Regions:
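Class I S-adenosyl-L-methionine-dependent methyltransferase catalytic core
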Residues: 1-149
Length: 149
């Protein structure tokens, strides 16, 4: 990886429960290999898992091993308290365009359309952990973002 990683225990120990509102939504990105752990993290942070959302990416070659080419990433949607959604979304999967960085895709970069979806479904305030860029109306935290703007 071209960025530092954390263990499951380190992620579960993050003080998210202490900074999230008592009524809040959580959108937790994961990949197929770590779906079970995502549920554990959500619960450790005081959230109740509700459903798994899927980003179905257009394939780009065969990638690394296994019987199936990994062309999906997932977002575990979880709730804490009774925060109502702003609208009901008619799908749990999307084929968003892959974000590009320079001459090609950047590993782990998430599509802007995802944040637009969050803004349409979940009331603020909004916090993004491990952010790569600032976004108006969001508080961001991450070692790749310059400052919260």
């Amino acid at each position: 990886m071209d960025y530092p990683t954390m263990t499951l225990a380190e992620i579960e120990a993050m003080p998210v429960a202490g900074v999230a509102d008592k009524d809040a939504h959580l959108y937790l990105w994961t990949i197929n290999r770590y779906v079970e752990q995502a549920y554990s993290v959500a619960r450790a942070w005081g959230f109740r898992p509700v459903c798994l959302l899927t980003w179905a990416k257009t394939p780009r070659g065969l990638g690394l091993g296994g019987a199936f080419v990994q062309t999906t990433e997932h977002i575990l949607f979880a709730r804490r308290g009774t925060l109502k959604a702003l609208r009901r979304e008619p799908s749990t999967w999307w084929n968003w365009t892959r974000p590009e960085a320079g001459t090609g895709p950047k590993h782990s970069r998430k599509p802007e359309d995802f944040q637009t979806l969050v803004e349409a479904v979940s009331p603020g305030p909004r916090l993004e952990l491990f952010a790569r860029r600032a976004r108006p109306g969001w508080t961001v935290w991450g070692n790749e973002v310059e400052a919260n703007k």
